[in-house]
Amino acid sequence: MMEVESSYSDFISCDRTGRRNAVPDIQGDSEAVSVRKLAGDMGELALEGAEGQAEGSTPDKEASSQPESSDANTSS
């Protein structure tokens, strides 16, 4: 019971609010990343994701058609 009480008092004494398992505040130089650079990086991620989905969907269709044809061969 003492273990629970000590962790509770540690949590209450800290300056964090909200959910108990929330991410703590990030300390450091916040000026190191500019909004312009972040927006550019986000744009690149969106483009890479769209390309990856287009390429990734083609093999899935081929893979799904292969088991169907093999199932048809086994039931004949």
Swiss-Prot record:
Compositional bias of kind Low complexity: 43-56
Polar residues biased stretches: 1-10, 64-76
Keyword Secreted: no
GO biological processes: negative regulation of protein import into nucleus; negative regulation of transcription by RNA polymerase II
One of the record's GO molecular function terms: cAMP-dependent protein kinase inhibitor activity
InterPro entries: cAMP_dep_PKI
UniProt keyword annotations, A-Z: Protein kinase inhibitor
Disulfide bonds: none
Region (Disordered): 1-25, 43-76
Described function: Extremely potent competitive inhibitor of cAMP-dependent protein kinase activity, this protein interacts with the catalytic subunit of the enzyme after the cAMP-induced dissociation of its regulatory chains.
Family to which the UniProt record says this protein belongs: Belongs to the PKI family.
Protein name: cAMP-dependent protein kinase inhibitor gamma
Name of the gene: Pkig
